[in-house]
């Protein structure tokens, strides 16, 4: 920040009161103040907990770190209609609706406040995307909901773009399976979700190359 500063100069003869004088007020129009240094850092982990996640209000589901973007996380979650949830940087770190600086409901989930829980009006599968930013000595969060779109890209389908022909089918309930499109060639199966960033930041593949 830049601000004006006013001051006077005073002078005396050393060891004497003689010659004591004070200048007129001097104005310095622009003085740059010292930068405020925050003592907190972006979180390296993030968790979700709620009424539809594992054991209700007992399972802290870890989110996936976005590749190369510190403080950004995502997770694929099924919410029952009217489900509620919170989030935290670690287990038992209960953060709710009031902690969110900005909501971006890109999937029509119907997000609202319910006793500081985040309520999801419309049931179904969603991609939950959370961005944490440092704001002074606290965190500022942006919460986005996206449609549960998962795509195959790369050599197994011969396409490196989001292509509707290579999108997984989405189950209607939490017990269903996401079914991949038919692969057209051999190679490493590369998959990603779709959000407002580069696809390779949201990429995942088969565990141990098999499951």
Language model feature labels by segment:
Residues 1-211:
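Insoluble glucan recognition modules
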């Amino acid at each position: 920040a830049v601000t004006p500063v006013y001051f006077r100069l005073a002078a005396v003869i050393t060891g004497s009161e003689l010659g004591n004088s004070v200048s007129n007020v001097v104005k310095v129009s622009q003085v740059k103040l010292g930068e405020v240094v925050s003592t907190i850092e972006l979180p390296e982990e993030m968790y979700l907990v709620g009424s539809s996640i594992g054991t209700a209000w007992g399972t802290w589901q870890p989110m996936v770190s976005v590749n190369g973007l510190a403080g950004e996380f995502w997770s694929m979650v099924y919410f029952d209609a009217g489900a509620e949830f919170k989030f935290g940087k670690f287990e038992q770190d209960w953060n709710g609706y009031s902690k969110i600086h900005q909501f971006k409901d890109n999937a029509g989930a119907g997000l609202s406040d319910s006793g500081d829980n985040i309520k999801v009006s419309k049931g179904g599968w969603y991609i939950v995307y959370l961005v944490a930013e440092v704001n002074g000595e606290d965190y500022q969060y942006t919460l986005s909901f996206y449609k549960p779109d998962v795509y195959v890209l790369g050599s197994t389908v011969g396409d490196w773009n989001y292509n509707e022909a290579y999108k997984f089918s989405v189950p209607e309930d939490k017990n269903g399976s996401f079914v991949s499109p038919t692969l057209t060639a051999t190679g490493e199966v590369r998959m990603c979700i779709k959000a407002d960033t580069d696809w390779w930041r949201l990429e995942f593949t088969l565990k141990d190359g098999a499951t």
